[in-house]
Amino acid sequence: MTTPRMSLLLICAVFALPAAAQPPKSARLIELPGSGTAALWSETIGGVEQAYYAVARGREPFGLAIPTTHVVRLRYAEFDPLHEAPEPGLMADPASELRIVQFFTQVLPEYTEAIEALGGRVLAILHDNAVIARVPATGAAVLRSEAWVRWIGPFHPAYKLEEALLAEFEQLVLNVPERVYSIQVFERGLAQQEVVAARVISLGGAVQCLTPPGRRMEARLSQAALLEIVGMDEVQFVDRWGPVETDMDQARVIGGAVPLLSGLGFTGQGVRGEVFDLGVRMSHMAFRDPNIVLHVTNTGSISHGTSTYGIVFGNGAAEPLGTGLLPNRQQGIFAAANQVTQFGGPKPRHDHTAELVDPNGPYRAVFQSSSVGSPWSLQYTTVSAEVDDYLFTYDLLSCQSQSNSGDQNSRPQAWAKNIVAVGGLDPHNTLDRSDDNWNYASYGPAADGRQKPDLLHFNEDVLCPSSSSDTSYQPNFNGTSAATPIVAGYFGLLFQMWHEGVYPGHGGAATVFDSRPRSTTAKALMLSTAYRYPLTQGGLTRARQGWGMPDLGRAYDERLNTYIVDETHLISAFVTNTYTFNVPDGTPQFRATLVYRDPPGTPNSSVHRVNNLSLRVVAPGGQAYWGNFGLTSSNWSSPGGAADFRDTVEHVFVATPAAGQWTVQVRGEEIVQDGHVQTPQLDASYALVVVGKGPEPVGCPGDINLDGQVDQADLGALLSVFGTIVGQLSYNGLADLNADGAIDQADLGIMLSAFGGGC
């Protein structure tokens, strides 16, 4: 038996506490399902009490000490259920098996297995340390007695409704007309959707669409029928559906497309991408040689899509100043938005995206640009979750207009984590950045505090093709509808640069599509090298400019001092992957950027990040910088602080870094859902871009310690972890040379084939 005093002594011995900390409080150990142990304690630092936990499995040591809180974070309310729990008007039926289960630690695979053994099923992740689960009453009674369960309570229908819909019920609003609703079920596929569809029909409603590869459906319902549907255990969340809505010579110069990149031959050769809009004038002279390839149909108004397509792919025929970013593209693709279920069509967006990235299909696109979206929202909606779902599954670099509301009302697609959301500014028709200002583009942050937009560009005075005739142009296309295809075009150039070996050790496959980096890597490169405006200039706060304006001239200039992890290193919970870099004296900046794809968030939750990977950088003198800390109010990171537990994009930017060894850490703070489905373990992959290292080449296959040589030190590092798999604390993602989740004979073979060589 472990006494409280023994627990205290163990925790003090294992975990090094900050110098300013008092001895830990409330220290205890709890047994986890299987053979694991969790250590729980709290520390008082600066007068503030902070709870922590750490987990050990079997005979392995304890992993990272994770700071935590015990708040159930719902859109409906945030509460500590041991102190207060809401009693909503729309309460769960006593027969409902939907429950919130909160633990003392993050969600572990052992918890999921234990719930399944009781006849239950984990359906969705909630924060902090909680799940939505379907558990029969007998199983719930057992869970309440488990030491690793902190609280279990009902998941009420009130938690499933968009705020405006809930207000109608609570305020007894009568005569609400029938509407089309977007309904998200818990489980992927048609099984639950068809159960809900049958109930919709029995209530006199009409099913608008189902999504076989996804979890979202649409139905027209009366208010009374909606109340019945939201009470079903198959239903996770409901919000209102709405139809599709719409939201250049200087733009090419300011980001380096001309004259620098065009002079080097980067004008889109080999690049294939899609513009997703309403309709397009197929016969425009600027769209010939090659002609547009349609992704199925071309229906709807052609005015908006003609301009957005031209900004990306136009060849400048009849007006050279209106040339697009990729005039020499291999293939421009156009898709009409109203063919997909999000906008009233028959095709799920999952299927549409799968077709784009099918290596054996006709499109083979490396990016998509969308300047259309669903009606404005301040929230992470069922549509936002659907976007994160298909982009997580199919790894497409997708750019989405934030919109033009003048406030935080934005396209719900832009609130997705895995998309590149694009804001806008007024350049005043000059190349002088000092006169640029924000005007009316929608801005962030997202409802949960995540940084949006990601990037921005011109939203005024963009010269581009128009739909009036086959030779017509307009001089003042505007809005984030203009900014988004500009940014997408720059991504197209980045894919070409990658393919042609601008970044040593990357690219070089048969085609741009075959060479392409992961979408996270492209995003990390573009965000790291973007031009960041002074946050005091013209209303261009962090929430309005995001991480800045694409600057591929800068990216090209820094190419030889850039280290890249292209989702080739894996990480599991409680593990840290560590990288070291020698920074020469006189280096102007040291920048580290972490981006990871995340499974779709839970619309019911007030926190939409699922997994939590954190970035930490340590200077030669020991000063630590946490990702994003200080960057809301400055373009440079502040030392100290704490981990960012909401964003899936993290940066550390340091001006005039001290010469010497800098350490970059990627920490697996919380991995509760599989982020790297190619391996059977619960793990995640990520993109990491570090700019400011010395000129020596590092990071070729087998160079585990990143010193530019594959030698005895690297072989020793691999052999010390040989036989481990991702999920074990001793696993080292840098030694998993083929990124298959296991350090084995295949990795040793890669090492030996490179042994004795340099990078």
Question: Residue ranges of each PLM-predicted region?
Answer:
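The feature captures the short pre-catalytic strand/loop hairpin that immediately precedes
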Residues: T430-D435, H457-P485, D566
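Surface-exposed beta-strand/loop patches in noncatalytic accessory domains
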Residues: A117, R121-I125, H608-R646
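Cellulosome-associated attachment modules in secreted, modular CAZymes
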Residues: G508, P695-C759
